[in-house]
């Protein structure tokens, strides 16, 4: 298992992932990642055995499900195909929850590093059970871990980024980038709730806008011969159809065929879905479509067709890093590209107008951990 993986079913269809840890681990090459119980991202050590690790600042984990109003007039009718698709996903996530309750007895997340402004002390002890102890901001740790404080951003090893809109920087990327074994996209799907959020990320305005934007992404020119494409999408049937329609879908336009339909199921700290599974208004999961070039002879394990990634959600718009989930199907030292990225990954490229968002030092702290070997 990877460092961020807390549980994986024997058939591989269910993976319990710690979301912040998946992003922390992606700041290093896979070979440098430690086990879940060990400190992550060790950047410096002191003579008394104290190690400093770079930790991602997270939001408090949800302890109870969200309350969301259902439509007063009931749900809008869905096409038959969309109804079947939703029922299949619902069955998958229900099965994933049952798998966890039956075969897993550990925690559903690792200790989180909360923002200093949210750490409420009570008699000198933090009251949030999920806060990582012994933390400081990068400025106050600068004399201990100077390598983490140079410049405004933290850059993972061998990471590359192209900052700008797709339209403005497409030529630059095509001229400078290699072909990629895996391409991950997190498009800015039109989303009213994202528009309402203060400081929310940029989203497309209309369905026509997002289609034009995706059509402008040169996937055929960027993808290696046997490469994979993973694309996040909302639960809106029109967007799923926009991607997968055999007649005029974006995947078909890119010369790709669908090989996997994964789901990211968001749960509370006690493994309850953050929203009712049968909610007509909002779903507790997000689809992740996996595709490859048409005619590819690659053979996938059975669990790749339908897989459920389970995790406790974090800050809005922050998704699990899936590098270590797709790596087993890729050649060693594969090259990856994340499009519409908001953070960087070691050894990968990132492309978009907000690629450095979560790489800012303000999103990270240095946390102290004592060496068990010395007891200091």
From Swiss-Prot:
What are the alphabetically sorted keywords of the record?
Answer: Autophagy, Methyltransferase, RNA-binding, S-adenosyl-L-methionine, Sporulation, Transferase, Virulence
Check the UniProt entry and state the signal peptide residues, or none.
Answer: none
- SUPFAM superfamilies noted in UniProt: S-adenosyl-L-methionine-dependent methyltransferases
**Got a GO cellular component term for this one?**
nucleus
- Extract one GO molecular function annotation from the record: methyltransferase activity
User: Which positions form S-S bridges?
Assistant: none
User: Transferase as a keyword?
Assistant: yes
Enzyme class, top EC level, equals transferase
Description of the deletion phenotype: Affects vegetative growth and conidial formation and results in increased sensitivity to various stresses. Decreases pathogenicity and activates plant host immune responses.
What is the E.C. number? Answer: 2.1.1.348
One BP term from GO:
methylation
The reactions it catalyses are: an adenosine in mRNA + S-adenosyl-L-methionine = an N(6)-methyladenosine in mRNA + S-adenosyl-L-homocysteine + H(+)
Asked if the keyword Methyltransferase belongs to this entry, the reply reads: yes
Q: Which PANTHER family match?
A: N(6)-ADENINE-SPECIFIC METHYLTRANSFERASE METTL4, N6-ADENOSINE-METHYLTRANSFERASE
Q: Which family does it belong to?
A: Belongs to the MT-A70-like family.
- The molecule here is called N6-methyladenosine RNA methyltransferase MTA1
Q: What is the originating organism of this protein?
A: Pyricularia oryzae (strain 70-15 / ATCC MYA-4617 / FGSC 8958)
């Amino acid at each position: 298992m990877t460092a961020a993986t807390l549980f994986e079913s024997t058939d591989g269809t269910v993976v319990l992932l710690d979301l912040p840890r998946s992003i922390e681990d992606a700041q290093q090459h896979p070979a440098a990642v430690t086990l879940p119980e060990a400190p992550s991202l060790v950047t410096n050590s002191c003579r008394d055995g104290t190690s400093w690790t770079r930790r991602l600042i997270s939001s408090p984990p949800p302890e109870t499900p969200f309350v969301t109003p259902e439509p007063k007039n009931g749900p809008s009718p869905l096409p038959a195909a969309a109804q079947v698709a939703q029922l299949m996903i619902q069955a998958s996530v229900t099965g994933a929850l049952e798998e966890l309750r039956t075969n897993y007895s550990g925690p559903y997340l690792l200790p989180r590093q909360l923002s200093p402004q949210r750490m409420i002390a009570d008699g000198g002890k933090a009251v949030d059970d999920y806060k990582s102890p012994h933390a400081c901001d990068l400025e106050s740790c600068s004399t201990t871990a100077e390598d983490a404080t140079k410049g405004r951003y933290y850059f993972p090893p061998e990471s590359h980024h192209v900052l700008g809109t797709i339209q403005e920087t497409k030529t630059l990327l095509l001229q400078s980038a290699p072909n990629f074994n895996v391409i991950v996209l997190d498009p800015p799907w039109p989303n009213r709730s994202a528009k309402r959020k203060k400081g929310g990320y940029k989203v497309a305005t209309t369905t026509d806008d997002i289609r034009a934007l995706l059509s402008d992404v040169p996937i055929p020119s960027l993808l290696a011969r046997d490469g994979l494409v993973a694309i996040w999408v909302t639960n809106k049937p029109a967007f799923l159809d926009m991607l997968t329609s055999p007649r005029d879908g974006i995947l078909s336009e890119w010369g790709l065929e669908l090989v996997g339909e994964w789901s990211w199921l968001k749960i509370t700290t006690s493994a309850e879905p953050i929203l009712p599974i049968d909610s007509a208004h909002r779903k507790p999961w997000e689809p992740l479509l996996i595709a490859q070039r048409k005619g590819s002879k690659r053979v996938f394990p059975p669990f790749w067709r339908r897989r459920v990634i389970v995790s406790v959600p974090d800050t809005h718009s922050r998704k699990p890093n899936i590098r270590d989930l797709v790596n087993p199907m890729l050649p060693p030292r594969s090259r990856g590209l994340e499009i519409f990225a908001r953070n960087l990954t070691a050894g990968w490229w990132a492309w978009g107008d907000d690629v450095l968002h979560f790489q800012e030092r303000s999103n990270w702290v240095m946390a102290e951990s004592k060496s068990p070997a010395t007891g200091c």
